């Protein structure tokens, strides 16, 4: 019930954990169970964040700006969808010089980039929670009040 900012923080931590599992697990310990477990963690993260994010927008933005707020969120998301494949491609090219077969690439750096995004999301989640406590937006309160 409620806990929007907390769910964002938990989702960010889970995203970090998942990508660090992919980045630093030694090859001899990287079994299908580990891989599937990391993907399940990522799935939970990807479920928590939108479930908390979208219902929180009306708590932060006046009703008359709500449509614009959602459009800005989609705009920023689409910028990320456009730029991050380029960034990851550049990172793969820079760290796998001389590797002809893409299935032989080392994906550690891209996973660390994604883990870093999890850290950034965690920091922003903490900042959001602090701001919510100061200004009383109600991000930690349920949307439906009895």
Annotate each PLM feature.
Residues 4-53:
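C-terminal transmembrane helical hairpin of 12-TM major facilitator-type secondary transporters
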Residues 7, 69, 110-113:
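Alpha-helical transmembrane segments of multi-pass secondary-active solute transporters
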Residues 22-26, 85-97, 129, 133:
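Juxtamembrane/transmembrane-helix interface segments of polytopic membrane transporters
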Residues 54-60:
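Intracellular helix-loop hinge segments at the cytoplasmic ends of transmembrane helices
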Residues 63-97:
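A late C-terminal transmembrane helix in Major Facilitator Superfamily
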Residues 90-118:
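A membrane-interface helix-boundary motif in multi-pass transporters
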